[in-house]
Amino acid sequence: MKHTNLAFAALAAATISTGCNRGFDPDSEIGLVSREDGSGTRSAFVELTGVQRKAANGKKIDETSPATMVASSTAVALTTVASDPSAIGYLSLGSVNDTVKILLIDGVAPTREEIAAGKYALVHPFNVVCRDSVDNLKPAARDFLDWILSAEGQKIVEQAGYLKVGSTPPYTGKNGVSGKVVCSGSSSVTPCMEKLKEAYEKTHPQVSVEVQQSDSSTGVSDAKDGVCDLGMASRALKTSEKNSGLVAVAIALDGLAVVVNPANPIVSISKESLRAAYTGKITRWNEVK
């Protein structure tokens, strides 16, 4: 992996004990890993951490350092951090596995309880996007969405490691619904949608749900152009997208996990430190405060 000229501020030096962390060098430069432009996960991260600023004319500017390693998907971000002791990145909490270590943010862990209590700072919605109104969806797509938002669907959301959204009425459903539903977009939303697809198809054998992974912007565009029934986005719609007639429906809440290689001894980092690192204000692990 190509290293950046950036570093990460985290806990005080007392949290670092390198003797048992073979492969980690506190004097090394940090390998920052970011998602690509178009990723809803990136959009949420830069907004929530302050890496994105608003110019005087109101335009939003993403100040992620150009030296940052850009990962084209959740899987690439995960494997990149897992393979480099000095790397750090961010991804959907539901996509984390034991090849990386999750950092606390300002001492708070991204647990379901902390997210629900509003204590964890990096939280974003998983949305599905359609044109005009959900009432205009074809019957199979509308039924699938109704099922996702029901108690049955939201149970699957929670079992997959995410938080349910709002009240969860029982599923009433439509008799005899059939056909194909195409979902397209975010690689962060994809694992959750795959679980929902699997459970829905078991009880609706006449409906086929196809999940196409790309990124949030592609999912939004596909929904607008009628390429898919439901776009998948791990961010809110932009004003221009809303003005084009698109609507978003939240199907889950997800924590953004900031992850490092297991060899890294740091356990917690502040939002301010994340902002400073991803904008290039600090450059080495030994600058940790």
Predicted regions and their residues:
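Hydrophobic alpha-helical targeting segments used for export or membrane insertion
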Residues: 11-12
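Exported/periplasmic ABC-transporter solute-binding proteins
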Residues: 20-289
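Bacterial N-terminal signal peptides that target proteins for export
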Residues: 1-7
